């Protein structure tokens, strides 16, 4: 049977084939006529690209059908180089989990009474849960910078 192959230039070539011929055979015949290597050829019929291992009858290609020949495009996006960093990556700080850490803030005396070792900041800006640092003669809040000086009887 006779089929037509339309190239990109608009030129139509005729090929004598059998329905049992594979797509590879058709590409070889196109190479004989046009000189285009089979690995660069893409044949399209009814909007589908024809795969090499299949036959013409698999795609229901009948006599006087027209195949479209396009050239294969190689490659894709440009390959990017791997970046070389001059300084090593900074290691993220991992918070250490200490069991019963809350016990550092309280002291239990021999009578069983609980005393707070640190003082909470009284500022409205800080709120509850912000403890003040204990200095030699004062308490200091690192968040709002409030300082409370000890009296002799406070210690």
UniProtKB/Swiss-Prot annotation:
The keyword Transferase does not apply. It comes from the Eukaryota. Transmembrane segments: none annotated. A zinc finger (C4-type) spans 121-144. There is a cross-link at residue 48 (Glycyl lysine isopeptide (Lys-Gly) (interchain with G-Cter in ubiquitin)). It holds the Pfam family Ribosomal_S27. The record marks 54, 72 as: Interacts with activating enzyme. Keywords: Cytoplasm, Isopeptide bond, Metal-binding, Nucleus, Ribonucleoprotein, Ribosomal protein, Ubl conjugation, Zinc, Zinc-finger. There is a cross-link at residue 76 (Glycyl lysine isopeptide (Gly-Lys) (interchain with K-? in acceptor proteins)). InterPro entries: Ribosomal_eS31, Ribosomal_eS31_euk-type_sf, Ribosomal_zn-bd, Ubiquitin-like_dom, Ubiquitin-like_domsf, Ubiquitin_CS, Ubiquitin_dom, Ubiquitin_ubiquitin-like. GO terms for molecular function: structural constituent of ribosome; zinc ion binding. The keyword Cytoplasm applies. The record marks 68 as: Essential for function. One of its GO terms (cellular component) is cytoplasm. GO terms for biological process: translation. Residues 1-76 form the Ubiquitin-like domain. Ubiquitin is synthesized as a polyubiquitin precursor with exact head to tail repeats, the number of repeats differs between species. In some species there is a final amino-acid after the last repeat. Some ubiquitin genes contain a single copy of ubiquitin fused to a ribosomal protein (either eL40 or eS31). PANTHER family: UBIQUITIN. In the N-terminal section; belongs to the ubiquitin family. In the C-terminal section; belongs to the eukaryotic ribosomal protein eS31 family. This is Ubiquitin-ribosomal protein eS31 fusion protein. It comes from Plutella xylostella (Diamondback moth).
């Amino acid at each position: 049977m006779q089929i037509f192959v339309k190239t990109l230039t608009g030129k139509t070539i005729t090929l004598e084939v059998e329905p049992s011929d594979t797509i590879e055979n058709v590409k070889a015949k196109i190479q004989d006529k046009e000189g285009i290597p089979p690995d660069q050829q893409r044949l399209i019929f009814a909007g589908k690209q024809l795969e090499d291992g299949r036959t013409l009858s698999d795609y229901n290609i009948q006599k006087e059908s027209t195949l479209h020949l396009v050239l294969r495009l190689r490659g894709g996006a440009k390959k990017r180089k791997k970046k070389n960093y001059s300084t090593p990556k900074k290691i993220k700080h991992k918070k250490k989990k200490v069991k019963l850490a809350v016990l550092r803030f309280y002291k239990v005396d021999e009578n069983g009474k609980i005393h707070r070792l640190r003082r909470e900041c009284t500022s409205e800006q800080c709120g509850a849960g912000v403890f003040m640092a204990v200095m030699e003669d004062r308490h200091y809040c690192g968040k709002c910078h409030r300082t409370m000086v000890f009296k002799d009887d406070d210690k």
